[in-house]
Amino acid sequence: MSQTREDSVYLAKLAEQAERYEEMVENMKAVASSGQELSVEERNLLSVAYKNVIGARRASWRIVSSIEQKEESKEKSEHQVELIRSYRSKIETELTKISDDILSVLDSHLIPSATTGESKVFYYKMKGDYHRYLAEFSSGDAREKATNSSLEAYKTASEIATTELPPTHPIRLGLALNFSVFYYEIQNSPDKACHLAKQAFDDAIAELDTLSEESYKDSTLIMQLLRDNLTLWTSDISESGQEDQQQQQQQQQQQQQQQQQAPAEQTQGEPTK
């Protein structure tokens, strides 16, 4: 018996409850590849599925990279460092496969079938996110390519969001949150990151009284994350200005901080209501 679209969505929900996210991905990928535009619920299920699958690997990569840094500073640990690097490479292969998978679905099916401004922003934001994840661990030409692709997708999403979504819309706020993380972590541009986050926060504050009751919780949650990142980043900028003589040491500390305590970002695409 062939599996219907409704069956795939139901099985994806079942897989989510069972925390079997790889199967959730497969079911939602089947829905996404149908050529029909996804509903808001289907869109969120797809986002949750891929974010759980890749989120576990991103967390693993940060932990292993942190251990690698510590071992590199020790004497007589060359063999252990080689083992760690091989293990990190295995995780990076998995990260690449997952990212390439969803990026292919986005380019082949989801973006071409999107008809509303909301869905276009959602998918271009996703495209920016997954290229950013590739840039997190890549180097050389691969990092440059992933960085440029992420920037282009985020810019496209921002242009559409500015004209078609209000400043308080959860998807527009989530885009600003993740785009600012891109500037801070990938492009090492704290000034751009702070400017973008502050602008999004201020624009939303100015129209807070227009928020509907159903969107209020989602929007204010993301606004809090924007403010949390601004607090973290502005303190980093202040410290760097006061400690120019210890610049090299501070850069190492910042790298460790990024691996162990990353800035807040929107991890589930559009919050479910």
UniProtKB/Swiss-Prot annotation:
Residues 245-261 have a biased composition (Low complexity). Belongs to the 14-3-3 family. GO terms for cellular component: cytoplasm; nucleus; plasma membrane. This is Protein BMH2. It is found in: Cytoplasm; Nucleus. Residues 236-273 are annotated as: Disordered. Residues 262-273 have a biased composition (Polar residues). GO terms for molecular function: DNA replication origin binding; phosphoserine residue binding. SMART domains: 14_3_3. Gene3D superfamilies: 14-3-3 domain.
